[in-house]
């Protein structure tokens, strides 16, 4: 009975105070905010919260007193789950200081009250689904709490341990990369009034030791019960106004400057504790007691003994990374005035280095004993001959030395800056540069054999001016015969039409939209780096419904790992989308031997983006991975398939749970007909008898009906062709019923408008005298970022800007 009364109070408080307060934080106000106001950062998360909270308010208005009817609706559970995730993100987000953890107690109170309300409802109903979402919130809170606690280091309250006044000083700064090992201890210092204070000891890579105070005086959370008790304790402290509780002080605070060798000595020692004292006679003693006795005996005890050794040369208990820094000179601490908080740091002036090295030849400096003109005139014939010989010898020695271009960098060399940049994954596909995919099914060994490969960046080629032929100015006017013998770098390789074959199993020629895939070395690493073939098993709680197979096709699959794409298998894999006993659709990948490679639950947090004509990228949270052969589990996949648009369309509908399964008499038992609950047409035609998708049902950006052959326009004398664009570097694809788009030609494209009796009748695409086709304006469709299709032909441009401008130009006719 008490639990029900408490729940009624929480329900009323949630409706009358909590939700209106949260709505005030996230609502879109008409008044202009400061540029530095965190709420002025209107990103997608703010918009999401601004849309969720009013919906929950209206739901509470419909059920102001009956919370059972409120949670009988499944949408209410979904909205409250999204609300908890959003509040958790804003609580630990660093940029949102107005609503961050510990900076706005009212916002923190709203979040904690919402959690207590949902936790009590889940225990009273009971509701397994709501209980799982509350447990998920506990796990996310525990992970973020431990991460923020361990990574937040404060250096603003450092006291001088060796002095008699214990003033605030500026310590030597360091980061987490300098830490070799860290563990928890209890410290007692009567002089500084520390009694069983929870601290954390850091073993640094320079051999020093740092003592950090644990501000919350709690150890990391490991269970959901500990997380629940912590949340309830925070709620009680806020209700009572106990804002000075240590729980609201996040992170670690450095107590003393880093302890160097010979700063302290051992006064007493036992198996489970050690007593240290200073050598300056200020009477400071530090008693350290470890939480982990095993780590104390194996690591910390030998380390502290070597750090406080009596001998002049301490024991070499150092890391292998930097042994030479043990005997580094002691830096003088800058003492600040009494009562001053912060860091008293005296920054050293950086040395400005000017690079005066040039590529010009430097003349030999004149000798100090150079002869004057009057002295040369007074020399006899023998002296003059000796002077002439010495001058010729010095000139010959200088001319024999070839210049070494050490300070000259070739333009075609790979840049280290590009290799060190973090990859921009294709979650957004509005970038300018396009990585055009090579088709696996085309024969690269065409009729031209040794002709240069088609290079879209040929117009940006620059010569390498690093070779000096002669120092004479007359050579500037000589004709370079080698240029006439070179083949032009702008020549295009003409690829012969070959039969449609299955793509080779060795490797894909390029991967979808990888940001650093422009170099040849990165492509070779992708093809050679494949995941080790193995298998995995589904959990016993997950059962796949093989009678409801929504998709069954062959794909090339790879994951983004260690700044490169890694294949799951060098051969083609079988991709299936099936239903499960948990009510969620599963993304299942198997090899030829039916060995399970990957199983992912399709959820709302999936991001599906089209990168090239035959590739899509899928980003998902690691919690959706049910089984995987890859370790760690992937979070970004690239799927290549000729029918990739059908896969993307199906995954988007499964993500929104808009797939309706119906039976059909004209289908086999293993097949399933899909009716997608959206305004777009179904991805399957009505007469499909198996799960091999055809291109006729693809869905593109502007496509709302099936493919049709381009209309053949009138080619009489009255139909004129006017040139619109000339010599654009493109790739031409033709559609094949079995394999989809097949690249047939690369070269320069001319675009014409067709006019008949003064009116526009269509457009004409011409690559050479033998390859040209005509299309009506209505048949032009955008495919992906860089493609424009005209019936069964697809023109792929160099980047998105060229494709957009061409499409706009033709659409304006």
UniProtKB/Swiss-Prot annotation:
Q: Where is this region: Disordered?
A: 478-537
Organism domain of life: Eukaryota
**Where is the sequence biased in composition, kind Low complexity?**
506-537
Q: What's the family?
A: Belongs to the UPF0508 family.
* Stated name of the protein: UPF0508 protein KLLA0A06237g
């Amino acid at each position: 009975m008490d639990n029900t009364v408490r729940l009624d109070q929480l329900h009323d408080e949630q409706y009358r105070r909590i939700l209106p307060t949260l709505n005030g934080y996230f609502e879109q106000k008409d008044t202009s905010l400061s540029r530095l106001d965190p709420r002025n950062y209107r990103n997608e998360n703010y918009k999401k919260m601004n849309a969720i909270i009013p919906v929950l308010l209206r739901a509470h208005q419909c059920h102001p007193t009956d919370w059972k009817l409120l949670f009988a609706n499944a949408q209410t559970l979904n909205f409250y789950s999204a609300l908890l995730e959003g509040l958790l993100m804003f609580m630990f987000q660093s940029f949102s200081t107005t609503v961050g953890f510990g900076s706005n107690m009212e916002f923190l109170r709203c979040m904690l009250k919402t959690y207590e309300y949902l936790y009590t409802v889940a225990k009273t109903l009971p509701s397994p689904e709501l209980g799982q979402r509350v447990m998920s919130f506990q796990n996310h809170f525990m992970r973020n709490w431990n991460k923020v606690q361990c990574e937040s280091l404060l250096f603003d309250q450092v006291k001088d341990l060796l002095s008699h006044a214990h003033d605030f000083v500026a310590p030597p700064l360091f980061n987490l990369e300098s830490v070799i090992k860290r563990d928890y201890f209890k410290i007692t210092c009567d002089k500084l009034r520390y009694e069983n204070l929870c601290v954390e000891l850091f073993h640094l890579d320079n051999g020093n030791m740092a003592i950090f105070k644990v501000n919350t005086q709690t150890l990391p959370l490991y269970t959901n019960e500990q997380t629940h008790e912590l949340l309830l304790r925070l709620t009680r402290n806020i209700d009572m106004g106990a804002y000075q509780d240590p729980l609201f002080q996040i992170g670690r605070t450095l107590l003393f400057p880093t302890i160097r060798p010979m700063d302290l000595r051992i006064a007493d020692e036992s198996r489970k504790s050690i007593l240290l004292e200073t050598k300056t006679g200020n009477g400071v003693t530090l008693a350290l007691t470890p939480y982990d006795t095993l780590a104390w005996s194996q690591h910390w005890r030998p380390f502290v003994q070597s750090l406080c050794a009596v001998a002049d040369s301490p024991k070499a208990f150092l890391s292998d990374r930097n042994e030479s820094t043990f005997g580094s000179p002691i830096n003088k601490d800058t003492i600040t005035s009494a009562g001053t908080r912060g860091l008293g740091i005296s920054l050293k002036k950086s040395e400005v280095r000017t690079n005066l090295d040039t590529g010009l030849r430097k003349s030999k400096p004149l000798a100090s004993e150079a002869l004057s003109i009057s002295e040369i005139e007074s020399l006899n014939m023998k002296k003059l001959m000796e002077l002439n010989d010495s001058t010729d010898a010095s000139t010959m020695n200088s001319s024999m030395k070839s210049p070494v271009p050490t300070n000259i960098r070739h333009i075609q060399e790979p840049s280290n800056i590009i290799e060190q940049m973090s990859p921009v994954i294709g979650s957004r596909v509005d970038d300018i540069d396009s990585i055009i995919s090579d088709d696996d099914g085309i024969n690269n060994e065409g009729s031209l054999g040794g002709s240069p490969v088609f290079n879209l960046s040929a117009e940006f080629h620059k010569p390498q001016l690093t070779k000096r032929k002669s120092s004479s100015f007359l050579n500037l006017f000589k004709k370079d015969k080698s240029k006439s013998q070179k083949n032009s770098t702008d020549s295009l390789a003409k690829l012969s039409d070959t039969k449609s074959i299955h793509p080779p199993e060795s490797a894909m020629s390029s991967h979808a939209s990888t940001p650093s895939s422009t170099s040849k070395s990165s492509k070779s690493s992708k093809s050679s780096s494949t995941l080790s073939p193995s298998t995995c098993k589904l959990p016993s709680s997950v059962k796949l419904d093989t009678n409801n197979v929504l998709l069954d096709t062959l794909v090339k699959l790879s994951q983004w790992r260690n700044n490169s794409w890694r294949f799951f298998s060098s051969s083609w894999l079988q991709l299936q989308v099936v239903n499960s006993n948990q009510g969620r659709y599963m993304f299942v990948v198997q090899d030829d031997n039916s060995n399970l490679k990957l199983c992912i639950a399709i959820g709302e947090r999936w991001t599906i983006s089209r990168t090239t004509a035959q590739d899509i990228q899928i980003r998902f949270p690691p919690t959706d991975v049910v089984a995987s052969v890859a370790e760690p589990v992937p979070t970004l996949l690239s799927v290549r398939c000729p029918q990739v648009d059908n896969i993307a369309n199906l995954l988007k509908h499964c993500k929104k749970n808009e797939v309706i399964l119906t039976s059909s008499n004209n289908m086999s038992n293993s097949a399933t007909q899909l009716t997608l609950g959206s305004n777009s047409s179904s991805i399957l035609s009505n007469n499909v008898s198996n799960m091999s998708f055809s291109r006729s049902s693809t869905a593109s950006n502007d496509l709302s009906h099936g493919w049709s052959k381009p209309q053949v326009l009138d080619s009489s004398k009255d139909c004129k062709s006017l040139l619109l664009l000339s010599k654009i570097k493109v790739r031409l694809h033709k559609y094949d019923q079995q394999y989809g788009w097949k690249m047939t030609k690369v070269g320069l494209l001319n675009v014409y408008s067709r006019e008949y009796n003064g009116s526009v009748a269509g457009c004409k695409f011409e690559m050479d005298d033998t390859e040209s086709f005509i299309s009506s304006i209505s048949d032009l469709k955008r495919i992906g970022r860089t493609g424009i299709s005209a019936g069964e032909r697809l023109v792929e441009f160099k980047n998105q800007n060229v494709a957009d401008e061409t499409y706009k130009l033709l659409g304006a006719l």
